[in-house]
Amino acid sequence: MAPATEAAPARTYDDEAAYVTVDDAHRVRVARGFVPNMRVDGVVYVNAALRALVLEELAAYCDATAHRGGGYSPALKQIANVAALPGVVGASIALPDVHSGYGFAIGNVAAFDVGDETSIVSPGGVGFDINCGVRLLRTNLTEAEVGPVKEALAQSLFDHIPVGVGSRGIIPTTPAALEAVLEMGMDWSLREGYAWAEDKEHTEEYGRMLNADPSKVSARAKKRGLPQMGTLGAGNHYAEIQVVDEIYDEFAAKKMGIDRVGQVCIMIHSGSRGLGHQVATDSLTAMERAMERDGIEVNDRQLACARISSQEGQDYLAAMACAANYAWVNRSSMTFLCRQAFAKMFGKPPDELDMHVVYDVSHNIAKFEEHMVDGEMKTLLVHRKGSTRAFPPHHPLIPVDYQYTGQPVLIGGTMGTCSYILTGTEKGMRDTFGSTCHGAGRARSRNKSRHVLQYEDVLEKLKTKGIAIRVASPKLVMEEAPESYKDVTEVVNTCHDAGISKKCVKLRPIAVVKG
């Protein structure tokens, strides 16, 4: 691997902060020079309160007693390091839920010009849980109907959907079926009877990335994925029964089949499980070899990458597409199980309960898209890590049903807090490559959360709020407690006020199922 650029001498916080300037009430700019070799600026969407959080993290990093101990660099440094990657255009963009991660910060968007032969693809810009995403189903049920049975319904969901670390799926999957899943995505779900035709229409990429090549997925990745189809997993993944709490845009909400406060919806948050993690892990070794061969230098080893046009780059994109297809089938399988649970509870088939998919979005993926850069339409490889595609009205890649509203964007809150449906805007298309936030974003590490919170207290608070809770690993709930995250409403409002997405519906949970 080519040597990483030598780090600049340690600077004081004041030295570092001089490179971070306020553009407006919703945005700060990280100027070139903040880290070596920046080709574009960093642009971070934050309001005053969220700005204070990212600057506090930078201040802690600059304190000689608080850093140099390993771990991730602060989010501002990671955003700037991405701005130094070959072929990057526009800006390295961070959304309000940004926090440090592996390579790219979580909440980072970066686009690379396919027409530039030096442009790269980086697994760190997608993440280990490839196509981690969110799906929302609506129903014609009301809180008055579901509230009295929410405990039983939460238990039914918990019984139907395998959850937790190492959970095994109940959707029968043979090695041959897995090959088809990796290649076909939701077309497999449709063929096998686990999805409705409209589900596919209301899924990003229509639930299938066409460049998928199962031969590029390792045997180990397939072995990990085989038993996990239709499983929720652990961490911040969940299935929630939610009710409509507020409607901000009645026209858009009605297009989504949401027409009243108190209407019951179901949100599913999960990804590609062990298969996606293994695809990412496998790619890093190949990327390091490619960097050494092609003389690619990066500021951080975790930004291992390869030229898009290289064999390594193409192999990763083909394997990543397989993992993305797996994730869509995984969420489709859980949708099937969720529909079964509701049908059993209410004694009606799912179609009579109007259990249609509103939309399914990915927030860990890299895709080829057309965007305007400096007045010229270009094909870009857009990396979205912990950020969501948010295309505007009339965009050709969003469903007919949403041509007048813009793409629905699903923003999951933290355990026990509200979630949101947003819609994409033209301003977002211009300013953020058609991207917005994906959730609340961590404010406290998992490790710190485990040390300062008690799981009994977290569960008791949820019960006090009237939320039914089923958890496979109770001692891990501290990691996902609301206190461990930023305020999702602050995050969503920042994006709304900046004009990069528009608030449509607010949802609140009445039952939560977690791993």
Curated annotation (Swiss-Prot):
Residues given in the record as Mn(2+) 2 binding sites: 132, 269, 363
Top EC class of this enzyme: ligase
One GO process term, biological-process aspect: tRNA splicing, via endonucleolytic cleavage and ligation
InterPro entries named in the record: RtcB (IPR001233), RtcB-like_sf (IPR036025), RtcB_euk (IPR027513)
Reactions listed under catalytic activity: a 3'-end 3'-phospho-ribonucleotide-RNA + a 5'-end dephospho-ribonucleoside-RNA + GTP = a ribonucleotidyl-ribonucleotide-RNA + GMP + diphosphate; a 3'-end 2',3'-cyclophospho-ribonucleotide-RNA + a 5'-end dephospho-ribonucleoside-RNA + GTP + H2O = a ribonucleotidyl-ribonucleotide-RNA + GMP + diphosphate + H(+)
GO molecular function, one term: metal ion binding
Cofactor(s) listed: Mn(2+)
Active site: 438
Residues reported in the UniProt entry to bind Mn(2+) 1: 129, 132, 237
A single GO cellular-component term on record: tRNA-splicing ligase complex
Keywords, alphabetical: GTP-binding, Ligase, Manganese, Metal-binding, Nucleotide-binding, tRNA processing
E.C. designation(s): 6.5.1.8
Matching Pfam families: RtcB
UniProt cofactor note: Binds 2 manganese ions per subunit.
Function: Catalytic subunit of the tRNA-splicing ligase complex that acts by directly joining spliced tRNA halves to mature-sized tRNAs by incorporating the precursor-derived splice junction phosphate into the mature tRNA as a canonical 3',5'-phosphodiester. May act as an RNA ligase with broad substrate specificity, and may function toward other RNAs.
Subunit structure: Catalytic component of the tRNA-splicing ligase complex.
Protein's name according to its UniProt entry: RNA-splicing ligase RtcB homolog
Organism per entry: Ostreococcus tauri
